[in-house]
Amino acid sequence: MMNGAGKSDRPVVPEKSPNNAGQPVAEGMEGSGLAKGNLLEQNASRTPSRGDALSALGRVRQAAKKDKKLRFTALLHHIYSLETLRMAYFSLKKEAAPGVDGETWRHYGEQLEVNLQNLSERLKRGAYRAKPVRRVYIPKADGRQRPLGVTALEDKIVQRAAVEVLNAIYETDFLGFSYGFRPGRSQHQALDALYTGLLTRKVNWVLDLDIRGFFDHLSHEWLVKFIEHRVADRRVVRLIQKWLNAGVLEDGKRIRVEEGTPQGGSASPLLANVYLHYVFDLWVQAWRRKRAHGNMIIVRFADDIVLGFQEKSDADQFRAELTERMRKFHLELHPEKTRLLEFGPHAIDSRKWHGEGKPETFNFLGFTHICVKKRSNGRFTVLRQTIRRRLQAKLNEVKAELQLRMHDPIPEVGKWLQAVVRGHVRYYGVPMNRSALYIFRFQVGRLWHRALSRRSQNGRPLWDRMRRLINRWLPLPTVCHPYPLRRMGVIT
């Protein structure tokens, strides 16, 4: 599969390249000279059709692909195009919670064309104002709470439209090992790339990176500088600054935010990718080519990053230099959660020889990755299992919801549980994880049995009846994601 521009920059897990193939890092790209006009000015007075909007973005994409230093001077009219705004509106979740204005998707849609025309005019004349983000907290698997931002509906529409336009530029720039929140890329493609790299490259050490509070601490000043590498349209830059400076509303109080971008906003994933593209991706690619003495693999999904090294000395040196680089851009590696562990085909024997027990494991995108040897031939492979606390957290959610649905009709609850189990299997259904899938299905059935017994005046329903309900409504686990090496599913 090709990159967003139609061509991959490099294989996701390439072998070490010659040292003279380096690429400029972020510092070398700042102040890249005079802005060049993009010659893509469109007549914004007419109402464009869907084909016009897509064709215009296609020209932006081709220009960005052709000239990697081109700075676009006229982009705002693509964003306030009625067709772009309309496509953005229909791409939003219909049942999403409202922001500070209380506006819902359905209510806004009752006067959609009038509302979009009004929004377009405000964007055109610079009268659009971003509203503060309503902050809510959701529980994490480890018991802590993650802050999320609920954006006002019109801000969602404008952000989604802007992301559509900016993706036309940045998808030609982003590197192959970046997977998070990009068109045509997914978590399982990142998992496949990591699995393939661990099995096909000479990897003996894994560096599991954790950036402390990344979304809360990225620098607005640096982010704007990075955006300006490609965007010379000051109106678009100011639009982004409006979102960054809108602040958050928490417990009825508006809080000014001077750093970070709230998780939950439509633009946040793209802005985060732009930030890490310049802070991490370009730098690590140059480091691999110029500094690494052995093989090195890289997989990044947003701020979740795993690297593999052939040489421990490379891993130690890289970690030290990355720590300094992160500090320059107002970021910090978590000193306890960032770990270097022996992991690879020799890890089991090496640790056994040194009396250190089994190799350590690491977590990535919901899976615990474990060093094992196949029983059939003793060869090294990577076992991927559902993270235990993730599984338990999901069961806790099911338990709480069953209490609320205790008196609902059995078929209605059965359909809901069917969707829960199917969704869980659809994500976690990888080879050698079948036992965890069966445990999840069994535990869901047990929780359902307990909920039914509480509403029954005759005690618990007999297990034979319960078994029939489980077999009818809870699908059996299946492998939804075959071995990456077998299906050649790595995106490059």
Residue ranges and their predicted role:
Residues 1-492:
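Non-catalytic terminal/accessory segments
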